[in-house]
Amino acid sequence: MIRLNPNLKNLKKNYLFVDIQKKTDKFISENPDAEIIKMGIGDVTLPLCETVVQAMKKAAEEMGNKETFRGYGPYEGYEFLKEAISEKYKSFGAKIEPNEVYVSDGSKNDVANILDIFAKGSEVLITDPVYPVYLDSNVMAGNSVKYAEATKDNNFLPMPSEKSDIIYLCSPNNPTGAVYTKEQLKKWIDFATENGSLIIFDAAYEAFIEDENLPHSIFEIEGAEKCAVELSSFSKAAGFTGVRCAYMIIPNELEISGEKLGDVWLRRQSIKFNGVSYVTQAAAFASLSEKGKEETAKAVKYYKENAKIIAKVMAELGLYNIGSENSPYIWVKAPNSMTSWEFFDYLLKEANIVCTPGSGFGPSGEGFVRISSFNSRENTLIAAERLKKLKF
Protein backbone atom coordinates (compact mmCIF):
# COMPACT_ATOMS: atom_id res chain seq x y z
CA MET A 1 0.00 0.00 0.00
CA ILE A 2 1.30 3.44 -0.90
CA ARG A 3 2.46 5.58 2.03
CA LEU A 4 3.29 9.23 2.53
CA ASN A 5 6.77 10.44 3.33
CA PRO A 6 6.83 9.94 7.14
CA ASN A 7 8.99 13.04 7.56
CA LEU A 8 6.01 15.22 6.61
CA LYS A 9 4.60 14.50 10.06
CA ASN A 10 7.56 16.33 11.56
CA LEU A 11 6.68 19.60 9.83
CA LYS A 12 4.69 22.35 11.50
CA LYS A 13 1.02 22.24 10.51
CA ASN A 14 1.29 25.37 8.35
CA TYR A 15 4.00 27.39 6.65
CA LEU A 16 4.60 30.61 8.64
CA PHE A 17 3.02 32.94 6.11
CA VAL A 18 -0.12 30.79 5.88
CA ASP A 19 -0.70 31.32 9.61
CA ILE A 20 -0.14 35.06 9.19
CA GLN A 21 -2.66 35.20 6.35
CA LYS A 22 -5.26 33.29 8.36
CA LYS A 23 -4.91 35.66 11.32
CA THR A 24 -5.05 38.68 9.04
CA ASP A 25 -8.13 37.42 7.20
CA LYS A 26 -9.90 36.75 10.50
CA PHE A 27 -9.13 40.26 11.73
CA ILE A 28 -10.38 41.81 8.48
CA SER A 29 -13.62 39.81 8.62
CA GLU A 30 -14.21 41.10 12.16
CA ASN A 31 -13.07 44.64 11.33
CA PRO A 32 -14.14 45.27 7.72
CA ASP A 33 -13.45 49.02 7.91
CA ALA A 34 -9.84 48.59 9.03
CA GLU A 35 -7.28 49.83 6.49
CA ILE A 36 -4.63 47.13 6.74
CA ILE A 37 -1.03 47.80 5.74
CA LYS A 38 0.79 44.55 5.05
CA MET A 39 4.45 44.71 6.02
CA GLY A 40 4.91 41.00 6.57
CA ILE A 41 5.84 38.85 3.59
CA GLY A 42 8.86 40.03 1.62
CA ASP A 43 7.19 40.55 -1.75
CA VAL A 44 8.17 43.50 -3.94
CA THR A 45 5.57 46.14 -4.79
CA LEU A 46 7.19 48.26 -7.51
CA PRO A 47 6.65 47.24 -11.16
CA LEU A 48 9.41 45.80 -13.31
CA CYS A 49 11.77 48.42 -14.71
CA GLU A 50 11.25 49.60 -18.30
CA THR A 51 14.40 47.96 -19.66
CA VAL A 52 13.25 44.58 -18.37
CA VAL A 53 9.71 45.02 -19.70
CA GLN A 54 10.96 45.92 -23.17
CA ALA A 55 13.30 42.92 -23.17
CA MET A 56 10.41 40.61 -22.27
CA LYS A 57 8.27 42.06 -25.06
CA LYS A 58 11.06 41.62 -27.58
CA ALA A 59 11.74 38.05 -26.44
CA ALA A 60 8.03 37.20 -26.62
CA GLU A 61 7.90 38.56 -30.17
CA GLU A 62 10.92 36.43 -31.07
CA MET A 63 9.05 33.38 -29.81
CA GLY A 64 6.26 34.22 -32.25
CA ASN A 65 8.61 34.36 -35.23
CA LYS A 66 9.65 31.23 -37.11
CA GLU A 67 13.25 32.42 -37.54
CA THR A 68 13.82 33.31 -33.88
CA PHE A 69 11.58 30.82 -32.07
CA ARG A 70 13.28 28.75 -29.34
CA GLY A 71 12.12 25.49 -27.81
CA TYR A 72 13.70 23.80 -24.82
CA GLY A 73 16.67 25.75 -23.51
CA PRO A 74 19.80 24.43 -21.76
CA TYR A 75 19.14 22.90 -18.33
CA GLU A 76 21.76 25.20 -16.81
CA GLY A 77 20.66 28.38 -18.59
CA TYR A 78 21.48 30.25 -21.78
CA GLU A 79 25.09 31.27 -22.24
CA PHE A 80 24.24 34.97 -22.65
CA LEU A 81 22.78 35.13 -19.12
CA LYS A 82 25.52 33.01 -17.55
CA GLU A 83 28.15 35.33 -19.03
CA ALA A 84 26.34 38.40 -17.68
CA ILE A 85 26.19 36.85 -14.21
CA SER A 86 29.90 36.04 -14.45
CA GLU A 87 30.59 39.70 -15.23
CA LYS A 88 28.50 40.77 -12.24
CA TYR A 89 30.72 38.72 -9.94
CA LYS A 90 33.82 40.38 -11.35
CA SER A 91 32.48 43.67 -10.00
CA PHE A 92 32.66 42.10 -6.52
CA GLY A 93 36.22 40.93 -7.10
CA ALA A 94 35.05 37.32 -7.39
CA LYS A 95 36.16 35.25 -10.38
CA ILE A 96 33.24 33.10 -11.51
CA GLU A 97 33.30 31.38 -14.89
CA PRO A 98 30.07 31.14 -16.93
CA ASN A 99 30.17 27.33 -16.68
CA GLU A 100 29.96 27.65 -12.89
CA VAL A 101 26.55 29.34 -13.15
CA TYR A 102 23.34 27.25 -13.04
CA VAL A 103 20.17 29.24 -13.79
CA SER A 104 16.92 28.19 -12.09
CA ASP A 105 13.36 29.37 -11.54
CA GLY A 106 13.90 30.48 -7.95
CA SER A 107 16.28 30.23 -5.00
CA LYS A 108 13.52 28.78 -2.82
CA ASN A 109 13.50 25.79 -5.14
CA ASP A 110 17.28 25.53 -5.13
CA VAL A 111 17.42 25.58 -1.32
CA ALA A 112 15.35 22.41 -1.23
CA ASN A 113 16.30 20.76 -4.52
CA ILE A 114 20.03 20.65 -3.83
CA LEU A 115 19.29 18.17 -1.04
CA ASP A 116 18.47 15.60 -3.75
CA ILE A 117 22.17 15.10 -4.43
CA PHE A 118 23.29 14.54 -0.84
CA ALA A 119 22.95 11.45 1.33
CA LYS A 120 19.79 11.22 3.40
CA GLY A 121 20.33 11.64 7.11
CA SER A 122 22.98 14.33 6.67
CA GLU A 123 23.74 16.56 9.65
CA VAL A 124 22.71 20.13 8.84
CA LEU A 125 23.55 23.36 10.66
CA ILE A 126 21.32 26.40 10.18
CA THR A 127 21.56 29.77 11.85
CA ASP A 128 18.59 30.62 14.05
CA PRO A 129 16.51 32.65 13.26
CA VAL A 130 16.54 32.23 9.50
CA TYR A 131 14.43 31.64 6.37
CA PRO A 132 12.00 28.80 7.29
CA VAL A 133 12.58 26.84 4.06
CA TYR A 134 16.07 25.80 5.24
CA LEU A 135 14.53 23.92 8.15
CA ASP A 136 11.41 22.59 6.44
CA SER A 137 13.21 21.24 3.38
CA ASN A 138 15.69 19.36 5.54
CA VAL A 139 12.95 17.99 7.79
CA MET A 140 11.20 16.67 4.67
CA ALA A 141 14.47 15.09 3.53
CA GLY A 142 14.91 13.31 6.86
CA ASN A 143 18.07 15.18 7.78
CA SER A 144 19.25 15.98 11.31
CA VAL A 145 19.11 19.73 11.98
CA LYS A 146 21.14 21.69 14.53
CA TYR A 147 20.96 25.41 15.30
CA ALA A 148 23.63 28.09 15.57
CA GLU A 149 21.90 30.72 17.68
CA ALA A 150 21.91 34.28 16.37
CA THR A 151 21.29 36.64 19.27
CA LYS A 152 21.79 40.25 20.25
CA ASP A 153 24.92 39.17 22.14
CA ASN A 154 26.66 37.98 18.94
CA ASN A 155 25.14 40.71 16.76
CA PHE A 156 22.94 38.03 15.17
CA LEU A 157 26.02 36.56 13.45
CA PRO A 158 26.82 33.15 14.99
CA MET A 159 30.26 31.72 14.37
CA PRO A 160 31.36 28.07 13.85
CA SER A 161 30.93 25.66 16.72
CA GLU A 162 29.38 22.29 15.94
CA LYS A 163 30.61 20.11 13.09
CA SER A 164 28.02 19.25 10.44
CA ASP A 165 27.81 18.02 6.86
CA ILE A 166 25.90 21.00 5.44
CA ILE A 167 25.97 24.60 6.70
CA TYR A 168 23.38 27.17 5.61
CA LEU A 169 24.43 30.82 5.82
CA CYS A 170 22.30 33.77 4.72
CA SER A 171 23.95 37.20 4.43
CA PRO A 172 22.35 39.72 4.57
CA ASN A 173 20.29 37.53 6.83
CA ASN A 174 16.58 37.00 6.48
CA PRO A 175 15.01 38.00 8.90
CA THR A 176 17.58 39.93 10.97
CA GLY A 177 19.38 41.88 8.24
CA ALA A 178 22.76 41.11 9.82
CA VAL A 179 25.69 40.82 7.39
CA TYR A 180 28.87 38.77 7.82
CA THR A 181 32.23 40.48 7.32
CA LYS A 182 34.95 38.96 5.15
CA GLU A 183 36.88 38.00 8.27
CA GLN A 184 33.88 36.20 9.74
CA LEU A 185 33.17 34.33 6.50
CA LYS A 186 36.81 33.28 6.33
CA LYS A 187 36.37 31.56 9.70
CA TRP A 188 33.34 29.69 8.37
CA ILE A 189 35.27 28.71 5.24
CA ASP A 190 38.22 27.43 7.26
CA PHE A 191 35.84 25.54 9.55
CA ALA A 192 34.06 23.91 6.60
CA THR A 193 37.35 23.00 4.93
CA GLU A 194 38.76 21.42 8.09
CA ASN A 195 35.62 19.38 8.72
CA GLY A 196 34.69 18.40 5.17
CA SER A 197 31.47 20.42 5.27
CA LEU A 198 29.61 22.19 2.47
CA ILE A 199 28.44 25.78 2.91
CA ILE A 200 25.23 26.74 1.12
CA PHE A 201 25.48 30.53 1.02
CA ASP A 202 22.28 32.47 0.35
CA ALA A 203 23.01 35.91 -1.12
CA ALA A 204 19.43 36.78 -2.10
CA TYR A 205 19.67 40.24 -0.51
CA GLU A 206 23.20 41.26 -1.50
CA ALA A 207 21.88 44.15 -3.62
CA PHE A 208 20.82 45.91 -0.40
CA ILE A 209 24.32 46.08 1.09
CA GLU A 210 25.45 49.69 1.52
CA ASP A 211 28.69 49.22 3.45
CA GLU A 212 31.52 48.95 0.91
CA ASN A 213 33.55 46.84 3.33
CA LEU A 214 30.97 44.05 3.50
CA PRO A 215 31.09 41.16 1.01
CA HIS A 216 28.34 40.60 -1.55
CA SER A 217 29.50 37.04 -2.24
CA ILE A 218 31.24 34.31 -0.29
CA PHE A 219 33.50 33.89 -3.32
CA GLU A 220 35.18 37.17 -2.47
CA ILE A 221 36.98 35.16 0.22
CA GLU A 222 39.84 32.78 -0.53
CA GLY A 223 39.05 29.10 -0.11
CA ALA A 224 35.30 29.33 -0.70
CA GLU A 225 35.67 27.75 -4.14
CA LYS A 226 36.52 24.43 -2.47
CA CYS A 227 33.77 24.28 0.15
CA ALA A 228 30.80 26.46 -0.87
CA VAL A 229 27.98 26.97 -3.33
CA GLU A 230 26.08 30.25 -3.56
CA LEU A 231 22.42 30.95 -4.23
CA SER A 232 21.29 34.27 -5.61
CA SER A 233 18.15 35.62 -7.18
CA PHE A 234 16.60 38.34 -9.32
CA SER A 235 13.51 38.42 -7.07
CA LYS A 236 14.45 41.30 -4.78
CA ALA A 237 17.30 42.86 -6.77
CA ALA A 238 15.20 43.25 -9.94
CA GLY A 239 11.62 42.75 -8.73
CA PHE A 240 11.26 39.24 -10.19
CA THR A 241 9.09 37.67 -7.47
CA GLY A 242 6.36 37.12 -10.07
CA VAL A 243 8.74 36.34 -12.93
CA ARG A 244 10.92 33.70 -11.22
CA CYS A 245 14.61 33.57 -12.04
CA ALA A 246 17.60 32.73 -9.87
CA TYR A 247 20.92 30.93 -10.08
CA MET A 248 23.38 28.81 -8.18
CA ILE A 249 27.16 29.16 -8.34
CA ILE A 250 28.98 25.83 -8.12
CA PRO A 251 32.76 26.21 -8.50
CA ASN A 252 34.55 23.86 -10.88
CA GLU A 253 37.00 23.01 -8.10
CA LEU A 254 34.29 21.81 -5.72
CA GLU A 255 34.21 18.03 -5.37
CA ILE A 256 32.32 15.71 -3.03
CA SER A 257 33.00 11.97 -2.83
CA GLY A 258 35.38 12.32 -5.77
CA GLU A 259 32.70 13.82 -8.04
CA LYS A 260 32.50 17.38 -9.37
CA LEU A 261 29.45 18.83 -7.66
CA GLY A 262 28.50 20.87 -10.72
CA ASP A 263 28.30 17.72 -12.84
CA VAL A 264 26.17 15.96 -10.22
CA TRP A 265 23.82 18.94 -9.97
CA LEU A 266 23.46 19.17 -13.74
CA ARG A 267 22.59 15.47 -13.86
CA ARG A 268 19.91 16.07 -11.24
CA GLN A 269 18.55 19.06 -13.15
CA SER A 270 18.40 17.11 -16.40
CA ILE A 271 16.06 14.65 -14.66
CA LYS A 272 13.79 17.01 -12.72
CA PHE A 273 14.06 20.38 -14.48
CA ASN A 274 13.61 21.62 -18.03
CA GLY A 275 15.25 25.01 -17.70
CA VAL A 276 13.99 28.57 -17.35
CA SER A 277 12.01 30.09 -20.22
CA TYR A 278 13.82 32.16 -22.83
CA VAL A 279 11.58 35.18 -22.14
CA THR A 280 12.45 35.07 -18.44
CA GLN A 281 16.18 34.74 -19.07
CA ALA A 282 16.09 37.59 -21.58
CA ALA A 283 14.47 39.72 -18.88
CA ALA A 284 17.11 38.73 -16.33
CA PHE A 285 19.85 39.53 -18.84
CA ALA A 286 18.33 42.98 -19.42
CA SER A 287 18.35 43.68 -15.69
CA LEU A 288 22.13 43.18 -15.73
CA SER A 289 22.67 45.64 -18.59
CA GLU A 290 24.01 49.08 -17.69
CA LYS A 291 20.57 50.65 -18.14
CA GLY A 292 18.92 47.77 -16.31
CA LYS A 293 21.29 48.04 -13.34
CA GLU A 294 20.64 51.77 -13.14
CA GLU A 295 16.87 51.26 -13.08
CA THR A 296 16.81 48.34 -10.65
CA ALA A 297 19.17 50.20 -8.30
CA LYS A 298 16.54 52.94 -8.02
CA ALA A 299 13.97 50.40 -6.84
CA VAL A 300 16.39 48.93 -4.30
CA LYS A 301 17.14 52.45 -3.02
CA TYR A 302 13.39 53.11 -2.70
CA TYR A 303 12.90 50.07 -0.47
CA LYS A 304 15.98 50.92 1.59
CA GLU A 305 14.56 54.39 2.23
CA ASN A 306 11.32 52.76 3.38
CA ALA A 307 13.33 50.61 5.79
CA LYS A 308 15.08 53.62 7.26
CA ILE A 309 11.76 55.41 7.80
CA ILE A 310 10.40 52.51 9.87
CA ALA A 311 13.68 51.94 11.71
CA LYS A 312 13.79 55.61 12.74
CA VAL A 313 10.29 55.44 14.21
CA MET A 314 11.08 52.24 16.10
CA ALA A 315 14.17 53.87 17.57
CA GLU A 316 12.11 56.91 18.61
CA LEU A 317 9.70 54.53 20.36
CA GLY A 318 12.65 53.09 22.25
CA LEU A 319 12.45 49.71 20.51
CA TYR A 320 15.73 47.96 19.70
CA ASN A 321 16.01 47.23 15.98
CA ILE A 322 18.61 46.29 13.38
CA GLY A 323 18.70 45.47 9.68
CA SER A 324 17.71 48.62 7.86
CA GLU A 325 21.24 49.65 6.82
CA ASN A 326 22.09 46.68 4.58
CA SER A 327 18.78 44.88 4.25
CA PRO A 328 15.13 45.43 3.27
CA TYR A 329 14.02 44.13 6.67
CA ILE A 330 13.80 45.69 10.13
CA TRP A 331 14.24 43.24 13.02
CA VAL A 332 12.46 44.70 16.05
CA LYS A 333 12.51 43.65 19.71
CA ALA A 334 9.00 43.42 21.12
CA PRO A 335 8.30 45.69 24.11
CA ASN A 336 7.27 44.72 27.62
CA SER A 337 8.41 41.09 27.31
CA MET A 338 5.74 40.39 24.67
CA THR A 339 6.09 37.22 22.64
CA SER A 340 6.42 37.52 18.88
CA TRP A 341 2.78 36.63 18.27
CA GLU A 342 1.57 38.94 21.05
CA PHE A 343 3.38 41.86 19.41
CA PHE A 344 1.99 40.76 16.02
CA ASP A 345 -1.53 40.86 17.46
CA TYR A 346 -0.88 44.22 19.12
CA LEU A 347 0.36 45.87 15.91
CA LEU A 348 -2.53 44.40 13.93
CA LYS A 349 -5.15 45.59 16.43
CA GLU A 350 -3.71 48.97 17.42
CA ALA A 351 -2.05 50.08 14.17
CA ASN A 352 -3.65 47.80 11.56
CA ILE A 353 -0.14 46.78 10.48
CA VAL A 354 0.78 43.21 9.56
CA CYS A 355 4.32 42.13 10.43
CA THR A 356 6.00 38.72 10.69
CA PRO A 357 6.47 37.09 14.11
CA GLY A 358 10.14 36.37 14.72
CA SER A 359 9.42 33.01 16.34
CA GLY A 360 8.36 31.76 12.91
CA PHE A 361 11.99 31.98 11.81
CA GLY A 362 13.24 29.79 14.65
CA PRO A 363 13.39 29.56 18.47
CA SER A 364 15.90 32.42 18.78
CA GLY A 365 13.47 34.70 16.97
CA GLU A 366 11.04 34.64 19.88
CA GLY A 367 10.37 38.12 21.22
CA PHE A 368 11.09 39.81 17.88
CA VAL A 369 9.13 40.69 14.74
CA ARG A 370 10.27 41.34 11.18
CA ILE A 371 8.93 44.34 9.30
CA SER A 372 9.36 44.44 5.53
CA SER A 373 10.19 47.57 3.56
CA PHE A 374 8.64 46.16 0.38
CA ASN A 375 5.76 48.59 0.21
CA SER A 376 4.73 51.89 -1.31
CA ARG A 377 6.18 55.10 0.13
CA GLU A 378 2.64 56.25 0.91
CA ASN A 379 1.88 53.14 2.96
CA THR A 380 5.25 53.32 4.68
CA LEU A 381 4.65 56.91 5.78
CA ILE A 382 1.12 56.10 6.95
CA ALA A 383 2.47 53.12 8.90
CA ALA A 384 5.14 55.33 10.45
CA GLU A 385 2.51 57.82 11.65
CA ARG A 386 0.41 55.03 13.14
CA LEU A 387 3.44 53.58 14.93
CA LYS A 388 4.32 56.97 16.43
CA LYS A 389 0.97 57.01 18.24
CA LEU A 390 1.54 53.69 20.02
CA LYS A 391 2.07 53.60 23.77
CA PHE A 392 4.00 50.81 25.44
PLM region spans:
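PLP-dependent enzyme catalytic core of the Aspartate aminotransferase-like
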Residues: 87, 95, 337, 346-355, ...
